[in-house]
């Protein structure tokens, strides 16, 4: 009987540093999604620091890593140490690496506190789906509640992102959360005396919204040496399974920075481009005192303009490949967007599309 999780399971997936083999982790995370998990996928060649930062900012229950590069013992132990140092030892670590991880190394890692390293023997006994269900069952933990951490955050962050992340989790799971800590309810001194702008970025799936967002973040950090930025990024949930691929971090090269916070949300509904928790997530980021907030929607159709309700300035990202010029008249956001970005401008017909728009 397939295991059905009682809670919304969120897992960070990646292939380890110096490892270009991403086939295995892509297979695993797709099965996780089919079982209803929300997967924050980072891609391959990811460092421990990047993975741990993402796991803490996203407030996940687990991290799943494939490692075929030979340095797995040090890699997994350092990940465990970094989580513990930052008061997030509750985040469980799972891994696999085929025959590159020896049985005695697996035993050593289990004793060190790694939740589970799956061996080729486990694959033969349990099968792919059996291993994934085991991961999801072990991660089926409720994270609601106050963000009371016993140790200070040691990552180089200008704000305690653990508290911010947990408050957004509460908002996702409970709607208007009654469990928000006093620090998260009380506006910071900066947020009381300034207007915090929200830029909404929307567009069709694959138009390059995340790449545009990353470029804005890069330029923001370069131009303002003392300002902070928060990103709330939404991806669609699958109607059939409830799972979601939250993959915007793959395109984000500038977010591993002390002045940047990013949170990925699933819509947890079909036929919508935004999560029901977007409004409170933005409020939480404002209360925390971020200077600038970007809201990135899931891919939208011609009629969707829902992002306008949540932002001060809206941007519609599109490509030159939209068909005949008459198709532009059907796109609702072109009537309302403050900015239109024609991305992938190296494509044929880009100058014509600029004229048509």
Stretches with model-predicted labels:
Residues 19, 204-207:
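ATP-binding Walker
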Residues 128-198:
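Extreme N-terminal, non-catalytic leader segments
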Residues 14, 202-205:
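Residues at the beta-strand->loop junction immediately N-terminal to the Walker
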Residues 21, 32, 63, 109, ...:
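Residue-level signature of catalytic and energy-coupling elements of molecular machines
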Residues 18, 25-131:
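Cofactor-cradling patches in redox/metallo enzymes
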Residues 85, 103, 110-158, 313-357:
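Conserved phosphate-handling catalytic cores of large alpha/beta enzymes
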């Amino acid at each position: 009987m397939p295991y059905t999780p009682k809670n919304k399971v969120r897992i960070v997936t990646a292939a380890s540093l110096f490892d270009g083999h991403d086939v295995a982790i892509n297979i695993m995370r797709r099965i996780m999604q089919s079982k209803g998990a929300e997967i924050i996928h980072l891609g391959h060649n990811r460092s421990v620091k990047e993975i741990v930062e993402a796991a803490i900012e996203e407030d996940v229950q687990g991290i799943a890593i494939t490692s075929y590069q030979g340095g797995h013992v040090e890699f997994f132990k350092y990940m465990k140490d970094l989580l513990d140092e930052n008061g997030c030892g509750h985040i469980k670590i799972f891994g696999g690496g085929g025959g590159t991880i020896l049985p005695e190394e697996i035993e050593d890692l289990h004793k060190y506190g790694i939740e589970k390293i799956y061996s080729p023997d486990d694959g033969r006994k349990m099968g792919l789906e059996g291993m994934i269900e085991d991961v999801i069952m072990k991660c089926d933990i409720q994270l609601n509640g106050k963000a009371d951490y016993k140790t200070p955050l040691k990552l180089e962050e200008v704000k305690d992102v653990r508290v911010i992340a947990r408050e957004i989790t509460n908002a996702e799971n409970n709607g208007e959360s009654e469990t928000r800590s006093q620090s998260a309810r009380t506006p910071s001194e900066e947020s009381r005396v300034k207007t915090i702008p929200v830029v909404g970025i929307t567009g069709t799936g694959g138009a390059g919204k995340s790449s545009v967002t990353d470029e804005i973040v890069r330029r923001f950090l370069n131009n303002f040496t003392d300002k902070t930025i928060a990103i709330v990024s939404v991806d669609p949930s699958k109607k059939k399974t409830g799972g979601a691929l939250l993959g915007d971090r793959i395109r984000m090269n500038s977010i591993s920075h002390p002045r940047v916070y990013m949170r990925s949300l699933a819509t947890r509904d079909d036929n919508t481009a935004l999560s029901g928790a977007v409004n409170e997530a933005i409020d939480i980021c404002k209360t925390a005192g971020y200077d600038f907030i970007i809201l990135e929607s899931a891919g939208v159709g011609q009629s969707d303009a829902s992002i306008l309700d949540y932002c001060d300035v809206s941007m519609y990202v599109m490509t030159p490949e939209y068909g005949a010029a008459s198709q532009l008249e059907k796109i609702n956001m072109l009537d309302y967007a403050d900015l239109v970005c024609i991305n992938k401008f190296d494509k044929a017909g880009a100058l014509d599309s600029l004229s048509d728009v």
